[in-house]
């Protein structure tokens, strides 16, 4: 997932959460206070979880370039999963031209 897509989806989920919370708060006559608080808690928790999952997918999932090779977001390597086995060994790093910081 692209980072921009993730940001748009998180904004959409936040907007939906606000609209659902406002709708529940407007129904004062239909819900008792405890039921209304419970529903608000469920909405807030589920929307936060969905936004967190979308954010993780947008920030960590590799994307494919036009050469069909996997690159990490922002052309930097954030995750060991994306590295080939030769890169995982620190002993082979200088031989591969990797600068140790």
From Swiss-Prot:
Keywords: Host membrane, Membrane, Signal, Transmembrane, Transmembrane helix
Cellular location(s): Host membrane
Spans through the membrane: 38-58
Cellular component annotations (GO), alphabetically ordered: host cell membrane; membrane
Leader sequence residues: 1-23
Mode of membrane association: Single-pass membrane protein
Name of the featured protein: Uncharacterized protein VP11
Organism placement in taxonomy: Viruses, Riboviria, Orthornavirae, Duplornaviricota, Resentoviricetes
Gene from which this protein is expressed: S11
